[in-house]
């Protein structure tokens, strides 16, 4: 019996560019292995694929080496946040408060 292949997408974005790769991987492939097979790391200089958080349709995958991909999955490689959202919110609130008190 021939091995079944699954069609998936791998996406990554920077402020300058977006990558959307359509791939076929063997059934039983883990998220980590699918990312490696996609060739994304070769296309994006400096991308630390093993150290990057990954999600499927917006939900973070906590164990990409264990989680298996399914037909039609969109694997999303996330970049780290540039600023702490809580700190940014605090700064905006302080600025708004100062403007109201004038």
UniProtKB/Swiss-Prot annotation:
Taxonomic lineage from the root: Bacteria, Pseudomonadati, Pseudomonadota, Gammaproteobacteria, Pseudomonadales
Protein name listed in UniProt: Protein RnfH
Pfam families: Ub-RnfH
SUPFAM superfamilies: MoaD/ThiS
PANTHER family for this protein: UPF0125 PROTEIN RATB (PTHR37483:SF1)
Family: Belongs to the UPF0125 (RnfH) family.
Organism: Pseudomonas entomophila (strain L48)
Superkingdom to which the source organism belongs: Bacteria
């Amino acid at each position: 019996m021939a091995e079944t292949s699954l069609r998936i997408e791998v996406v990554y974005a920077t402020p300058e560019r977006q990558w959307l790769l359509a791939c076929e991987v063997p059934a039983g492939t883990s998220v980590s292995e699918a990312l490696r097979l996609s060739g994304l790391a070769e296309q994006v200089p400096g991308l630390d694929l093993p150290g990057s958080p990954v999600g499927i349709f917006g939900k973070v995958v906590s164990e990409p080496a264990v989680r298996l991909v399914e037909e039609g999955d969109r694997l999303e490689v996330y970049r780290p946040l540039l600023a702490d959202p809580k700190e940014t919110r605090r700064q905006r609130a302080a600025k708004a408060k100062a403007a109201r008190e004038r």
